[in-house]
UniProtKB/Swiss-Prot annotation:
Subcellular location: Nucleus
UniProt GO molecular function: cyclin-dependent protein serine/threonine kinase regulator activity; RNA polymerase II core promoter sequence-specific DNA binding
GO cellular component: CKM complex; mediator complex
Keywords from the UniProt entry: Activator, Cyclin, Nucleus, Repressor, Transcription, Transcription regulation
Keyword Phosphoprotein: no
SMART domains according to UniProt: CYCLIN (SM00385)
Stated name of the protein: RNA polymerase II holoenzyme cyclin-like subunit
Length: 346
């Protein structure tokens, strides 16, 4: 394993451009059509690798991980494995419940918190008895399939480490930059990173960019939440993410999922912040404590030489999660998978 992201297989083999990712998915669709035409698989028009499916698979991983008390880093690794695998294989030719189980099984090995194969099969069967086989060799076979499709590149770098490094760096250099990350801010940023695994960001951008984007949302956009909340009553948040990662107390200093959705809504005042990072003039704001901290954070970004275009790109995708989550239809995805998987058993 490379201790340096820039020399790692994650950077050199599995960091894609948006164009190459689009091309990879186009190839999967072409392969899928050929397999349907040749009678190798059946066509299920309601099965798509869209945001509904991605959120559903994310929730499956979280659910199984909680039953096994898996560390967050292993869950994150499993989700990247899943995303990589689905750039090469169609959903219509696999059992997604077995895929989720296998990704978590392999991730636990790599992240040095291994789970016995019989235990993980047992817990998966408790959750999804109609889809997970008793035979542990099925998981072992899928493990080799998964590793082969990822070209055996399994070690990963995550934004969590970058978050901790930035927090520690700011603590050590507080006299220079004049601010530090509070525990609440770190937790909010950590939560944003957790949810970011639903997106393609971890196939597209370096981990430190995602970490900085999560801090930016937490520190800078928080300044505008009080004003935005005045208009937030018109936003319908039913069906939003059932995430334990966000503080839902009515604390004006806390980040809320509704706030992020409002920021992502182009019709909402203040929602153009993400698209105007470089043009934001914080000096025009009232110089209260939060604004001073924002100015100091922007000064830190200026000195960091971080690619701000990539930070903006990451922020847009991260905030968009919550817009998509608001439209999430779990029952539709669950029913479509049920029809596909149970028909295979007939």
């Amino acid at each position: 394993m490379s201790a340096d992201f820039w020399c790692s297989s994650q950077r050199n083999k599995w960091q894609l451009s948006r164009q190459s990712l689009l091309e990879a998915r186009r190839k999967v669709l072409l392969l899928e059509r050929k397999m349907i035409q040749n009678g190798l698989i059946k066509d299920y028009p309601n099965i798509h690798y869209d945001f509904n499916m991605r959120i559903y698979l994310h929730n499956l991983l979280i659910k199984l991980g909680r039953r096994l008390n898996i560390r967050q880093v292993a869950l994150a690794t499993a989700e990247i494995y899943l995303n990589r695998f689905l750039t090469r294989v169609s959903l219509k030719e696999i059992n997604v419940y077995l895929l989720v189980t296998t990704c978590l099984y392999v991730a636990c090995k790599i992240e040095e918190c291994p789970q016995h194969i019989r235990l993980i099969i047992s817990e998966a069967r408790n959750l999804w008895p109609e889809y997970i086989p008793h035979d542990v060799t099925k998981l072992a076979e899928f493990e080799f399939y998964l590793i082969e499709e990822m070209d055996s590149y399994l070690f990963l770098h995550h934004p969590y480490k970058s978050l901790i490094q930035i927090r520690d760096f700011l603590n050590e250099n507080s006299a220079v930059f004049g601010f530090t990350l509070t525990d609440d801010e770190l937790q909010n940023a950590w939560s944003l990173v957790n949810d970011s695994y639903i997106t393609d960001l971890h196939l597209l951008l370096p981990p430190h960019i995602i970490a900085v984007a999560s801090i930016y949302i937490t520190i800078v956009l928080k300044k505008n939440l009080s004003a935005i909340r005045v208009n937030s009553s018109a936003v319908n948040s039913n069906g939003g993410p059932n995430s334990m990662m966000f503080n839902r107390n009515p604390d004006q200093n806390s980040m809320h999922i509704d706030d992020l959705m409002i920021l992502a809504n182009p019709s909402t005042p203040g929602s153009d912040l993400v698209n105007n990072l470089e043009r934001t003039n914080f000096h025009d704001m009232k110089l209260d404590e939060e604004t001073i901290k924002i100015n100091k954070f922007m000064n830190f970004l200026d000195h960091s030489h971080i690619n701000l275009d990539e930070v903006v790109e990451a922020m847009q995708d991260m905030i968009n999660i919550y817009v998509q989550w608001n439209r999430y239809n779990e029952q539709g995805v669950k029913k479509a998978l049920q029809v596909m998987l149970l028909n295979r058993q007939l």
